[in-house]
């Protein structure tokens, strides 16, 4: 699930906000939340906000090792769960909101119509039918669309692809290339 977190202890004792850096992640909802936080913190609290580009893995690594950015308003924490728990327990980071987007989830999805028409009820059922999901460049293979480079879900999905031996079962990875490419692949 998504998590919002930042470094602990950023506000000064007199309540003055000062300067903060906020990660502006490379997907639409995170861009929106970062810009909304910027408006609220600048207009409502007099903060000086700098938005810096980010993605889950790179932003977390930078926050963990360098303390920058100060805030990641939407981060897919499941991709960094173990090191995040360690950083929180060592008071380097604090989770401020465990679910900024209620009901958000991460997983592999297929459309309901294809599932129903082909009696696909389990992951094994789907993996056994690459013919239903043709690869855009090689119709003899099933196309398994992964997350863009730099996203934690790309690493997890590629490892699961290997673990389930999907390549041996007629599948080939489709690199979505970007957030927009991933959005465009959804029919």
Mark where each language-model region is.
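Short, well-ordered beta-strand elements
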Residues: 14-29, 47-52, 141-145
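Ligand-binding pocket segment of bilobal, Venus flytrap-like solute-binding proteins
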Residues: 61-62, 69-73, 145-187
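Pocket-flanking alpha-helical
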Residues: 34, 52-92, 185
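Bacterial N-terminal signal peptides
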Residues: 1-6
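Extracytoplasmic/secreted envelope proteins and their assembly/folding machinery
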Residues: 31, 35-38, 60, 81, ...
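Sec/Tat signal peptide C-region and signal peptidase I cleavage site
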Residues: 7-13
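A conserved helix-loop-strand patch within extracytoplasmic ligand-binding domains
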Residues: 92-145
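Short, polar/charged alpha-helical segment
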Residues: 28-47, 162
């Amino acid at each position: 699930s998504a998590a919002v977190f930042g470094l602990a202890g950023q506000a000064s004792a007199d309540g003055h906000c000062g300067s903060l850096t906020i990660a502006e992640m490379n997907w639409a909802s995170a861009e929106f939340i970062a810009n909304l936080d910027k408006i609220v913190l600048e207009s409502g609290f007099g903060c000086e906000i700098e938005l810096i580009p980010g993605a889950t893995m790179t932003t977390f690594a930078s926050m963990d090792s360098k303390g920058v950015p100060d805030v990641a308003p939407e981060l897919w924490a499941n991709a960094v769960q173990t090191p995040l728990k360690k950083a929180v327990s060592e008071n380097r980071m604090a989770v401020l909101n465990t679910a900024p987007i209620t009901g958000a989830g991460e997983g592999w999805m297929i459309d309901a119509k294809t599932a129903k028409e082909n009696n696909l009820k389990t992951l094994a059922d789907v993996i056994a039918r690459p013919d239903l999901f043709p690869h855009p460049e090689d119709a003899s293979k099933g196309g398994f669309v992964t997350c863009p480079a730099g996203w934690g879900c790309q690493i997890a999905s590629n490892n699961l692809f290997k673990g389930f031996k999907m390549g041996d079962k007629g599948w080939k990875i489709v690199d979505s290339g970007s957030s927009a490419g991933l959005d465009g692949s959804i029919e």
